[in-house]
Structures are given as structure tokens and as C-alpha cells.
């Protein structure tokens, strides 16, 4: 959830800013992060622990979308994979948006940390056009007073980012499915006492459902149709 933790899931019908479309209100980042999981199971196999569950969003007369999630954790290396399938269980086409919002803080995020990625920057929330994200060393500077958050948008490129932290002595590798996550968002709040970096495979930018519909980033799932999203996190010692 957005109260804390490594992963906050955004969707299923909207992500980004709150908007109203055709008389229906869509809250910031959607409802799925507040929806309890159902049918939760776990299984231990040689080399792997797997947890599965489902969660659905929908109201009478509105599209019915369901998330089926599998967490797989390796017992041989520091690797976690998240495999999500979002399906339209209704009888009419359903607009769909989705994002894996991954949060990182100290000591992974410090002034000595570096982000390496081949994603292709396409803009920022405030309308500026950024340079290569790997060259933005200010990503990791901690402010001496409260500052506004910053958001960068990128095309997913090869679907990989690496966060290297000499202070923590680790390299974190993030890989995601570029066929279903065509966008990548970097969110940074450098305020003292916050110091958080968000790395976010996404289907769209941050303007909300109305903007996504105008830009062509809103996905329409037909009845019975499903999309699969994959994100993998690997941590290695330097």
C-alpha cells in the first residue's frame, strides 16, 4: 500500500492523477492498493517459495477487472519476481491502467548511489525535457529543507534499471516486461526525513485516466481478455 513497503500497486482502471470521466470519479492511482486479497495460497518448492492471490475491483453496472498475482522468491539468490495477470471479467470493454510503484530509501538511496538504465526519457511532470537519467546525479542529493517531488517519464527501452549503492554494498537490478509496461517513471522526493526514490514500470504517464484516453495510453480490455505484467528484482553484493 501507499502507507509504506517495497511495492505499491496502481490501477486497475486508473493510475496517476485523480480525474472524472463520463461522470465516474477515478481516485489517485486507483483502488487496487486498498483492496484486500482473496484466495491467498503459498507453496514451497525446491529453490523457490511462491505466494498467489487475487483481488477484484468493480461495482454494479461498471467494468469488472481482476488482478491475479504470483510472488516468487528464490531460496538460492536474492531474487523476487512479481507476475500479474489483469483480466476483464465483465461483459463490456473495460478501460485499464496499471503500474508497479517500487520504493527505495536509505541506505540504497544516498548521495553516493547511481542509477544506470537505457530507458529513453520523454519528459517530466512539469513539462521539461530531461537528459539521460543515468547522468542526473542530482537524483540522489538530499535536500536540506522540504522540496517538491520530481517525476521523470521515459519509454521502457530494454526494460532494465540498476541502482548501485556503494554505501549499502549492493547492486539492485530491476527488470520488467516492456511489451506490457511500455513506460517507466522515476519519482524522487529528496526532502530531509523522506529521501525516497520510486522506480515504476507503467502503462502510462501520470496525468490520470482522462489524459491517458486522449494520448492513447488507456488500454481497452475486451470481455475475457487479459494482460500479463512481470517485474523482477535481483540484489547482488558489490
How should these model regions be labeled?
Residues 99:
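A short beta-loop-beta micro-motif enriched in histidine and acidic residues
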Amino acid at each position: 500500500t501507499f502507507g509504506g513497503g517495497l511495492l505499491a500497486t496502481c490501477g486497475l482502471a486508473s493510475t496517476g492523477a485523480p480525474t472524472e470521466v463520463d461522470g465516474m470519479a477515478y481516485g489517485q492511482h486507483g483502488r487496487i492498493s486498498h483492496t484486500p486479497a482473496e484466495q491467498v495460497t503459498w507453496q514451497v518448492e525446491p529453490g523457490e517459495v511462491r505466494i498467489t492471490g487475487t483481488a477484484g475491483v468493480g461495482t454494479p453496472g461498471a467494468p469488472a477487472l481482476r488482478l491475479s498475482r504470483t510472488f516468487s522468491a528464490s531460496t538460492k539468490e536474492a531474487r523476487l519476481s512479481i507476475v500479474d495477470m489483469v483480466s476483464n471479467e465483465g461483459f463490456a470493454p473495460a478501460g485499464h491502467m496499471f503500474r508497479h510503484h517500487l520504493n527505495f530509501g536509505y541506505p540504497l538511496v544516498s548521495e553516493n548511489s547511481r542509477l544506470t538504465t537505457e530507458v529513453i526519457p520523454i519528459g517530466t511532470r512539469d513539462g521539461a525535457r530531461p537528459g539521460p537519467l543515468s547522468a542526473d546525479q542530482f537524483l540522489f542529493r538530499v535536500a536540506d529543507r522540504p522540496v517538491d517531488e520530481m517525476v521523470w517519464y521515459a519509454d521502457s527501452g530494454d526494460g532494465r534499471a540498476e541502482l548501485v549503492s556503494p554505501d549499502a554494498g549492493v547492486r539492485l537490478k530491476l527488470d520488467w516486461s516492456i511489451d506490457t509496461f511500455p513506460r517507466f517513471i522515476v519519482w524522487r522526493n529528496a526532502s530531509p526525513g523522506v529521501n525516497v526514490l520510486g522506480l515504476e514500470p507503467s502503462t502510462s504517464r501520470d496525468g490520470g485516466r482522462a489524459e491517458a484516453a486522449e494520448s492513447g495510453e488507456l488500454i481497452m480490455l475486451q470481455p475475457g481478455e487479459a494482460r500479463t505484467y512481470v517485474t523482477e528484482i535481483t540484489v547482488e553484493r558489490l
